[in-house]
């Protein structure tokens, strides 16, 4: 189940191969004068699909960020996927962020719920309930943690590689959202948020909250 953490995400390999197939002959025939726009596109795609290895934040009972991005929501609300009141923390991913999604906790995958939907701006609150999304409900040492991949205005492809019954490790790569979007995290009300709206976070490196009894 563990992903080998390549420098370039596997989701980007087909794009790089296609651009390379076009760029190399153009460069060979016309030189850099003709091929430089294609090389710029190649470099942009290379940067876009980067997938660096991450070292988990140190400490006990930590809920790690599942994505790179910016905190847009920290609030108590209803978790519609686990039917409970919960602490919700949302990470907005723009097109320049790393797009891999990683587990926030160690735990057992109890449910995976997919919902087709719209593609409104993922920075808006209504994106959580109206957009295409994929919810993963995890039992983390008796605590329910819900991770929701949400598609956005540009991101229209949610990828999830895990199944019900899989065991995840905190920081383990479990999905990908092409071209950025949003990940909502729902935690028990006993969780203490460690981030605020506007904070910049990094998947696995940043702790979103502390949940007593998690470890």
From Swiss-Prot:
Site annotation Cleavage (non-hydrolytic): residues: 180-181
Record-listed E.C. numbers: 4.1.1.65
Domain of life (superkingdom): Bacteria
Pathway(s) annotated for this protein in UniProt: Phospholipid metabolism; phosphatidylethanolamine biosynthesis; phosphatidylethanolamine from CDP-diacylglycerol: step 2/2
GO cellular component, one term: plasma membrane
Class of the enzyme per the UniProt entry, highest EC level: lyase
MF term (GO), any: phosphatidylserine decarboxylase activity
Role played: Catalyzes the formation of phosphatidylethanolamine (PtdEtn) from phosphatidylserine (PtdSer).
Protein name per UniProt: Phosphatidylserine decarboxylase proenzyme
């Amino acid at each position: 189940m563990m992903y080998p953490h390549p420098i370039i995400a596997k989701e980007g390999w087909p794009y790089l191969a296609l651009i390379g197939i076009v760029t190399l002959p153009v460069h060979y025939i016309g030189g850099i004068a003709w091929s430089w726009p294609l090389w710029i596109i190649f470099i942009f795609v290379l940067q876009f699909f980067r997938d660096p290895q991450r070292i988990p934040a140190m400490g006990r009972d930590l809920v790690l960020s599942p994505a790179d991005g910016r905190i847009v929501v920290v609030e108590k609300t209803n978790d519609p996927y686990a039917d409970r009141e919960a602490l919700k923390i949302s990470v907005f991913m723009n097109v320049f962020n790393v797009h891999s999604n990683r587990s926030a906790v160690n735990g057992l995958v109890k449910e995976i719920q997919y919902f087709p939907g719209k593609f409104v701006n993922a920075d808006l609150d209504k994106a959580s309930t109206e957009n295409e999304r994929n919810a993963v409900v995890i039992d983390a040492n008796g605590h329910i943690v819900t991770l929701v991949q949400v598609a956005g205005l540009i991101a229209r492809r949610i990828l999830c590689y895990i199944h019900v019954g899989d065991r995840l490790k905190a920081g383990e790569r479990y999905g990908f959202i092409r071209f950025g979007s949003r990940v909502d995290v729902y935690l028990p009300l006993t969780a203490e948020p460690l981030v605020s709206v506007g904070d910049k976070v990094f998947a696995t490196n940043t702790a979103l909250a502390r949940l007593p009894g998690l470890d």
